[in-house]
Amino acid sequence: MLPSSRARSLAALGMTLATAILLVSSLTLLAALPASAQSPPPAKLAQSLERVYGAGARVDTIHVDSATVYRVSRAGALLGFARVRNVKGKERPITYLVATDSADALRDIDILVYREPYGGEVAYDPWRKQFRGKTAAAPLQVGKDIRNISGATISSNAVTRAVRKTLAELTAWHAQGRLQ
């Protein structure tokens, strides 16, 4: 019996069918890692929180359900809350931070890890600054109160939707007294 063309191709690469299946399975599992396994480096998170809230701010970790929230204060006065999340870009996760002030308005957003080959403009300050001061009552929609980025439509839409959802969660948890 002659080997199939696929088996001959694998043999030419020095792979058996079992090796090829193992390789494909491993790559599939790697791509499906949960968002929690794709967190930013601690130094990057610390730099982002310092940039947003200033040096010397105290950061306490709070757990609400399965979510991690950072409560930020200085000299006992609440500065706001921050949360790190992942959202799917075109193909890969985008790790971002949403930071609020004590009145639940967006203080800033930060792109902590951008993994896509294109669309990285969502990390640039001119695009991020349009979120500042927005509340959960704002539409936060690309094309309305948030500008689109030519060539980064998927990323700008994904980040905008994710920021809107995260801001709504933080605002609700704060109103419910769950962020103490």
Predicted segments, located by residue:
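Flexible, solvent-exposed loop/hinge segments and secondary-structure transition points
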Residues: L33-N157, R161-Q180
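A cross-taxon signal for low-complexity, glycine/charged-rich
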Residues: M1-V24, A31-P34, Q38
